Amino acid sequence: MDLAVALERALDARVVSMRSLRGGDVAEAYRADLDDGRRVFAKTHRSAPAGFFTTEAAGLAWLRAPMVVAVPGVLAVSDGDTGAEAPNHLVLEWIDEGSAGPSTEADLGRALAALHLTGAPCFGREDRRSTGSRGLPNEPCPTWSEFYATQRLLPLARLAGASGVLRASVISDLERVADRLDVVGGPPESPARLHGDLWGGNRLVDRNGRSWLIDPAAHGGHREFDLAMMRLFGGFGEACFAAYAEQCPLADGWVDRVALHQIAPLVVHAIKFGGGYVGAATTAIERYR
């Protein structure tokens, strides 16, 4: 069964056209037009691990639930549970992209602050589903320091060691950072509702200048993590961060912790891409060892 047939069964409508979309580095993405007038976004990942799209769909629904930030609605999801012949897929409502307006960045900052303030029941995920291409664990943890150490830094240290991308001395430094999070991590905070992979490519702007969040690695975490990701890869204006801080001020010393929260994504990228990410990850790790 091809993807078009799977979509027709899931959406109870005939696919009249499908167009491949560029930009995804993991899944194959498509725009599909249906005979009932709907246009949808669909993607498939033929070598995805078990539960890949179900996890993403749950994350999207969790971010969407408080109704404080725009997140595309999930129309259908399958991880191949309808039969081996049916490709796995995730179908979302279509967002017509446009250009940012004068208030786009500030509006996103306020919306993200509101999202974080809705909170999470734990650090991690209650459903314990792993996220991301590296399958990082999300076991529920009572504190951020325990979560970041046991569910991010230490698993990444093992992956980096196995891949050989980081020197043994840097792996030891990373393990030392995991042990020092109570010292370098700032004051304790309650778990925030995080997007978890918030770089510029995971934000769409529609024709009204409204920001939409996509492709999350959603979990309960430290709100500084989302903001550190946004600063790491760019794509967000200073008006966004200023509006966030006005709505939800950060604890003293947050500037000195930005690189701490960037360690995890930098190591992930070092493992995946090598190159300059290896040096950037090493620099961040050595800063907090």
Place the predicted regions along the sequence by residue.
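An alpha-helical support segment within catalytic cores of ATP-dependent transferases
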Residues: 2-4, 8, 82-83, 120-193
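Conserved N-terminal boundary motif of the eukaryotic protein kinase catalytic domain
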Residues: 12-19
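Active-site Asp-x-Gly
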Residues: 142-149, 158, 190-193, 200-259, ...
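ATP/Mg2+ or Mg2+-diphosphate-binding catalytic cores
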Residues: 269-289
